């Protein structure tokens, strides 16, 4: 199969939405029956984002095969059916590490290792390898044109376009077209300068996607086309909208997919966007509203919980409920008390690392249990629910996780020292293992117990969900906690690790060691989140006995 390539770059400022624009184009092409994949090339020197601060970089998205990747891959999977893998995201750090490893092995036969050709060749090889078997590969280069860090990537895609030829490669550039209220018009000069910068490194964009708070007027589109050397029909206006899921329709209405198909000589049927129309309809026509409290430690940057935020919205669509997320700093629960949790229709405690705010999360789980507020715990959110139950119901005073207190009398959560990964390989860890890339990662099989809420929600005896953790329930103390009434509703493939717990004495109290948010999509939702938001709606309507 011959693969065609669309290279996506950004200019003027960062955070323009390259990932959303690229994913929207991918969704339209997929709706035309094409097999589409996407890639994100990140210019930073970290080998992967696994150890980067969520408040700087946003969430780490985990793929089925266990890669810790950029959050844009989450957008990709929410917009298209293709599942991302470790091949779909790589960093400058990863490329340099590979090249240096080969140099140490002697693979380059004594050559002087340089950015060109060794680094650029390594980038090109990874792009080609990661796109095999698809009609179209959309490759997003992180950062902004002009950044020093992105230059090797820009040079690599320039070379690739030359090698592939115009019939198999094209460039799509995102820019900002700001509106100046004082002048009463949009300004095209930043776009012109951005394209000039791109031209200086040998790349002529074929399509310009212009971000603005309004549609770009026809005269300005003509001006941009003239000065940036692109066709007028290739100047696409991407105005601000109230939902990212409206972007596919917006850019399709301007013929973006037709430009791509014409360039590549692809004869494909018109895009069927009926599924996206249904999503937009559900979003615009809720029948009720719920407020869900997310108790976390990274709340100053909502992107730290991007997939959780989106999964809650998707669940709202499936229940025809408008979901308002109230972010609660877990440290506020510690200092101000549980009063900050009052008035919430449901409580969610997401994943996290470190002991800052941990007692606040434990108190949030206690508040939800005692006040019959629907509770969903994810990863650390499951562990704090277990710790709280052990302390306050099972009589295990001072119970804790060894992550936070190595000397606790009741270490109900401890480091996983051995497990079987998704490929059947035995993994081992110790307290002195590196932090990067050493967690239990990727999609794992989970057995669901009969007669549990988890089994009812999923409708299956076995499921596959993605993991990212290094601590687990201590099986030595499990019997005492279960005897006190907490139900273990999900177990790992070898039935040695606890994957889900629930409280049968509570209307809706479910927690999972895995990350269900990574597999939620706007078109399909996710059963765990759908059940949680449904319970929030029931609680809001006063249907739960308190």
From Swiss-Prot:
Residues given in the record as ATP binding sites: 15-20, 72, 239-241
Alphabetical list of Pfam families matching this protein: CTP_synth_N, GATase
GO biological process entries: 'de novo' CTP biosynthetic process; pyrimidine nucleobase biosynthetic process
Binding site for CTP: 14, 147-149, 187-192, 223
Domain of life: Bacteria
HAMAP family: PyrG (MF_01227)
Protein known as: CTP synthase
Source organism: Vibrio campbellii (strain ATCC BAA-1116)
């Amino acid at each position: 199969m011959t693969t065609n390539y669309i290279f996506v770059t950004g200019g003027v400022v960062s955070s323009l939405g390259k990932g959303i624009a690229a994913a929207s184009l991918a969704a339209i092409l997929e709706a035309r029956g094409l097999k589409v994949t996407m890639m994100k090339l990140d210019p930073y020197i970290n080998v992967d984002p696994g150890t980067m601060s969520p408040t700087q970089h946003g969430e780490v998205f985990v793929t089925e095969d266990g890669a810790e990747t950029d959050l844009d891959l989450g957008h990709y999977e929410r917009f298209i059916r293709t599942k991302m893998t470790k091949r779909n995201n790589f960093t400058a750090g990863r490329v340099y590490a590979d090249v240096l490893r080969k140099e140490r092995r002697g693979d380059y036969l004594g050559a002087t290792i340089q950015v060109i050709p060794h680094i650029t060749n390594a980038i090109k090889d990874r792009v080609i390898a990661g796109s095999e078997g698809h009609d179209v590969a959309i490759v997003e280069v992180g950062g902004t044109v002009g950044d020093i860090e992105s230059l090797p990537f820009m040079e690599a895609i320039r070379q690739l376009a030359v090698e592939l030829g115009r019939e198999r490669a094209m460039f799509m550039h995102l820019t900002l077209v700001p509106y100046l209220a004082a002048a009463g018009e949009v300004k095209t000069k930043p776009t012109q300068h951005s394209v000039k910068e791109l031209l200086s490194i040998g790349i002529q964009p074929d399509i310009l996607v212009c971000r603005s708070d309004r549609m770009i007027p026809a005269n300005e589109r003509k001006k941009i086309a003239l000065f940036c050397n692109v066709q007028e029909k290739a100047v696409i206006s991407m105005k601000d909208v109230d939902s990212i899921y409206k972007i596919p329709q917006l850019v399709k209405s301007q013929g973006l997919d037709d430009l791509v198909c014409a360039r590549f000589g692809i004869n494909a049927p018109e895009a069927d966007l009926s599924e996206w129309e249904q999503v937009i309809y559900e979003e615009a026509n809720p029948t009720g509203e719920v407020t869900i409290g997310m108790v976390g430690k990274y709340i100053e940057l909502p992107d730290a919980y991007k997939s959780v935020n989106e999964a809650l919205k998707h669940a709202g669509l499936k229940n025809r409920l408008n979901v308002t997320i109230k972010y609660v700093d877990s440290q506020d629960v510690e200092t101000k008390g549980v009063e900050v949790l009052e008035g919430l229709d449901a409580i969610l405690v997401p994943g996290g690392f470190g002991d800052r705010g941990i007692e606040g999360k434990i108190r949030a789980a206690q508040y939800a249990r005692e006040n019959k507020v629907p509770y969903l715990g994810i990863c650390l959110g499951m562990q704090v629910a277990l710790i709280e139950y052990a302390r306050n119901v099972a009589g295990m005073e001072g119970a804790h996780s060894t992550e936070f207190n190595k000397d606790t009398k009741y270490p109900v959560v401890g480091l996983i020292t051995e497990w079987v990964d998704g490929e059947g390989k035995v993994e081992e860890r110790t307290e002195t293992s590196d932090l990067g890339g050493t967690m239990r990662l990727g999609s794992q099989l989970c057995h669901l117990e009969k007669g549990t809420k988890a089994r009812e929600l999923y409708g299956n005896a076995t499921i596959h969900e993605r993991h990212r953790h290094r601590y687990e329930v201590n099986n030595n103390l499990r019997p005492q906690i279960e005897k006190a009434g907490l139900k273990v509703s999900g177990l790992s493939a070898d039935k040695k690790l606890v994957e889900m717990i629930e409280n049968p004495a509570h209307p809706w109290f479910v927690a999972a060691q895995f990350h269900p948010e990574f597999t939620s999509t706007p078109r399909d939702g996710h059963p765990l989140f759908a059940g949680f938001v449904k319970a929030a709606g029931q609680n809001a309507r006063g249907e739960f006995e308190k």
